[in-house]
């Protein structure tokens, strides 16, 4: 089975010595194969691996004769120190340790992939900063929108509350106005029936001022009967109601008739006495 596998491998890959296989022979060969196997899979460790150089001449001593010696042809001595750090725990005969390999790596020139990582990290940090700033900007705009919406809602609620209070105030003041109306002279309604009932249920006597009586007497001297228009004008001028003006003129005419009747009666008696 092993011979068939080896023959098939050599048939497929003419440069068999160029492709390294794990050799479980002696200790030195095993260590060499483990150390050199990293050169084939160096891409998995993040190093710069340019591929296998197939231009090397095929040796005459079989396919798997000297694996450790042929493997040295594919790598530079400067790269050996870097590749050896990945298998430092496996290579027992070498005195190199992880600490020394780390110091060598720090002192040596970093590969292009290592050099590209800071720039990539800086780009990532810049993109993260941009996204965070955008997110904060959007959060600020959302907060301002929310704050503006809450302020508008509060203003609408306050306006509605004030309107409700005004409506309640008007509804409460209307019955009070109906009970005790406060009517100014220029707002006085002329056909308001004022409550003039006294304590005994009778109509209270209207007390006119001297100025009102004088003005009414002057008007009665010129006109014993008033038209509706003139009555309204006098009522507004004297701060009285139309009904009060009408009643005063009725009473004044009755008094005037009574005085004239007495005067005519006295004249009649005087004339009859003179005739006799």
Swiss-Prot record:
Gene name of the record: hoxb5b
Start-end of Polar residues biased regions: 110-120, 144-182
InterPro entries recorded: Antp_homeobox (IPR050296), HD (IPR001356), HD_metazoa (IPR020479), Homeobox_antennapedia (IPR017995), Homeobox_Antennapedia_CS (IPR001827), Homeobox_CS (IPR017970), Homeodomain-like_sf (IPR009057)
Composition bias type Low complexity, residue spans: 86-98, 121-136
Region (Disordered): 63-182
Main subcellular location of this protein, as a coarse class: nucleus
Transcription regulation listed as a keyword: yes
Cellular localisation: Nucleus
The protein's name in its UniProt record: Homeobox protein Hox-B5b
GO molecular function: DNA-binding transcription factor activity, RNA polymerase II-specific; RNA polymerase II cis-regulatory region sequence-specific DNA binding
Any Gene Ontology biological process: heart development
Positions of short motif Antp-type hexapeptide: 183-188
A single cellular component GO annotation: nucleus
Function according to Swiss-Prot or TrEMBL: Sequence-specific transcription factor which is part of a developmental regulatory system that provides cells with specific positional identities on the anterior-posterior axis.
């Amino acid at each position: 089975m092993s011979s068939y596998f080896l023959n098939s491998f050599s048939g497929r890959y003419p440069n068999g010595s160029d492709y390294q296989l794990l050799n479980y022979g002696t200790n030195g060969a095993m260590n060499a194969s483990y150390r050199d196997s990293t050169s084939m899979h160096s891409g998995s460790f993040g190093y710069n691996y340019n591929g296998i150089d197939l231009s090397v001449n095929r040796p005459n001593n079989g396919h798997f004769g000297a694996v450790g010696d042929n493997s040295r042809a594919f790598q530079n001595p400067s790269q050996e120190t870097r590749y050896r750090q990945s298998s430092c725990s496996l290579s027992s005969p070498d005195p190199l340790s992880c600490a020394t390999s780390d110091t060598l790596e720090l002192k040596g020139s970093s590969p292009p992939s290592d050099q590209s990582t800071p720039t990539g990290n800086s780009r990532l940090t810049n993109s993260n900063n941009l996204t965070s700033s955008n997110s904060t900007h959007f959060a600020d705009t959302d907060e301002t929108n929310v704050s503006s919406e809450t302020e508008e809602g509060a203003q609408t609620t306050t306006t509605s509350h004030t309107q409700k209070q005004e409506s309640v105030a008007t509804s409460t003041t209307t019955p009070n106005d109906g009970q005790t109306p406060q009517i100014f002279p220029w707002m006085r309604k002329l056909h308001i029936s004022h409550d003039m009932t006294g304590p005994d249920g009778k109509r209270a006597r209207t007390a006119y001022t001297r100025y009102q009586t004088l003005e009414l007497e002057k008007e009665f001297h010129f006109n014993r009967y008033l038209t509706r228009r003139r009555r309204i004008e006098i009522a507004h001028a004297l701060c009285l109601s139309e009904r009060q003006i009408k009643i005063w003129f009725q009473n004044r005419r009755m008094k005037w008739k009574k005085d004239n009747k007495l005067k005519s009666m006295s004249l009649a008696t005087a004339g009859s006495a003179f005739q006799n």
